[in-house]
A protein has these predicted regions:
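Acidic/negatively charged segments and metal-coordination signatures
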Residues: 1-75, 82, 86-174
């Protein structure tokens, strides 16, 4: 989950209601959403750990056929990311120039006509070469998430342990 610089992130209760329905409407009567929500929570934790450690994660991308372009294959993932940004706009309201490139790597998969009020983003997208294949498209998405994390939750530099002075050498005898 992407957070802003103050560490504010949607809680599980905030985002879980959108797992079954984008608008957050309740599940139909009699439907037990528990197992699906448990899986979503588990995946969230996996992604959280990977992004926090800046490790590779495998986005769930399912190409439909060999004729499909890389952008068409990743579009459901990108659309989910965009929907999350609409629901939880803290990331998009940050004024951080370092976010433009990673957001462009994600949003370049949309039709340029769909990027309303995103002139700076559209300008950067025009300079990016589209991915040559699905592997490159997936790599760009993961890279974009890591770059976003670098801005929204920078790694804390671990304090260096202080070195203890070693044993003193005895004075030289004459």
């Amino acid at each position: 989950m992407v957070v802003d610089r103050e560490g504010i992130a949607p809680t599980a209760a905030d985002w879980q209601r959108h797992v079954l329905d984008l608008e957050g409407r309740p599940a139909p009567a009699g439907y037990d959403a528990g197992p699906l929500l448990a899986l979503a929570q588990r995946r969230h934790a996996e992604l959280q750990r990977a992004i926090d450690a800046r490790d590779w994660f495998d986005p769930w991308i399912y190409p439909n056929d060999e004729e499909e372009s890389p952008s068409e294959a990743v579009l459901p993932w990108v659309a989910g990311f965009a929907a999350a940004q609409d629901l939880f706009p803290a990331l998009m309201s940050m004024n951080a120039p370092d976010l433009v490139e990673p957001l462009a790597l994600v949003y370049l998969h949309f039709d340029p006509e769909d990027l309303e009020d995103a002139d700076a983003l559209a300008a950067v997208i025009e300079t990016i070469e589209p991915p040559a294949d699905l592997a490159e498209a997936v790599q760009d998405l993961v890279r974009a998430m890591m770059l976003i994390a670098d801005v929204t939750r920078p790694r804390r530099v671990a304090p260096q342990p202080q070195r203890r002075p070693g044993p003193r050498k005895p004075p030289r005898r004459r």
